[in-house]
Amino acid sequence: MTFGNDSRVLITGGTGSFGRAFVKTVLDRYPQIKRLVVFSRDELKQWEMQQQFPIEKFPQLRFFIGDIRDKNRLGRALEGIDTVVHAAALKQVPAAEYNPMEFIKTNVLGAENLVQACLDTDVCRVVALSTDKAAAPINLYGATKLCSDKLFIAANNIKGDREIAFSVVRYGNVMGSRGSVIPLFISLKDNKLTIQNQSKKIDANSLKKNQDSKVSLKRKPVLS
């Protein structure tokens, strides 16, 4: 994904692991970008990012406190935005089983709120981050992300004559992201490590690899 000097970008979940890496990459590669908005509900993490990216050095960076469950707040944040990267989600698999409606409210209803808010504004492209767990899901988290994916892809069929494209990007486990196994290993580095799930193997991508990846968007995404 490339941005021009006039690009106005908003990232939901902008204070998360991916969001922080995305913001840093965009500011490094496209320092002349017109606007980059971090949309998230975590006030403390926004403050921490403001210390990392001071406004004196990065005047194009803005912070917007809000929740994707709130469509009206989303609509306000999207004013003047042309590109949206959707990274906001609840993602802890065990937590989803005990709090199913909370995951549905954020991952499914939140996605629909974003779709409708984008259709009501001048956004021209939306990239939603997904997960390999949405393919043939075996848990509630994966099921909510599959529903989210379907909502974004289906939005291409209801956009009418609006110049907007919705896309979904799926990737696997990300090393170093919040809730991944790497931070757990680091926290246990001074203790004895018990080996569990000896028969299971997983593939994982580095956070840098994910945030460095270029996504090619077509004006009319292929539906499958």
Question: For the regions a protein language model found, what residue spans apply to each?
Answer:
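N-terminal Rossmann NAD(P)H-binding glycine-rich loop of SDR-like oxidoreductase domains
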Residues: 8-27
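Rossmann-fold scaffold of SDR-type NAD(P)-dependent oxidoreductases
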Residues: 12, 78-87, 128
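Conserved glycine-rich Rossmann-like NAD(P)H-binding loop of the short-chain dehydrogenase/reductase
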Residues: 31-45
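Conserved residues in the N-terminal Rossmann fold of short-chain dehydrogenase/reductase
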Residues: 40, 64-65, 105
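Short, conserved SAM-binding/catalytic segment
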Residues: 49-58
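Conserved Rossmann-fold cofactor-binding substructure of NAD(P)-dependent oxidoreductases
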Residues: 62-83
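Conserved Rossmann-fold NAD(P)-dependent oxidoreductase catalytic core, especially the SDR/UDP-sugar
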Residues: 86, 90-150, 154-156, 164-167
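NAD(P)-dependent short-chain dehydrogenase/reductase
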Residues: 140, 146-209, 220, 224
